[in-house]
């Protein structure tokens, strides 16, 4: 094959998006309702009794963090299940033996997972705008961070789906690592509110940089520089791309 097989990419992509449509309650409605409850409790109820954070009302302040929380978890979940299920049923071998390159397989699965996550993020954003006062100072960068993060962590989910040898392992890393890092990464607070020691410790949490950059696109303020946030996100992307390339080069947990 001399070029990209767009027909194959489109076929896999459409299949994954169709699965998203069949599981709409679980894939879209449930995360939106769960996040909306955070907005109601922390934003509308508790937020009215709290001081502004860096001049931003608390309800609006937590919006980027909560969107990022859903974006990270759903990107990983969508991509990991998308590639794990063919492994579980054995159809992955038909895919690997078909005239489809590894780049096309990755592009289709990761593209579908990222599309679902971006759609979810935009729906949550629209829901938040109804519940709390909200403004976006840098719409271009907001969309850029949204898409870049969705693609990056869809790659992470793809890796987890290949690595997992059971359904329980699909949730292992998201539950034990991603969710705690997101909650401790400034979703509900600014790390500047922490004592100096814990502020320094927080800088070792990579999710801090993702949330900080995304929050900057909304309010123009951030815990770390926007360049550092963008650099960390791109670093994640490069690392995950390298791991995916290694997986296909070695056939790790793909070849019988």
Report each predicted region and the residues it spans.
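Hydrophobic transmembrane alpha-helices and immediately adjacent juxtamembrane helices
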Residues: 1-139, 144-256
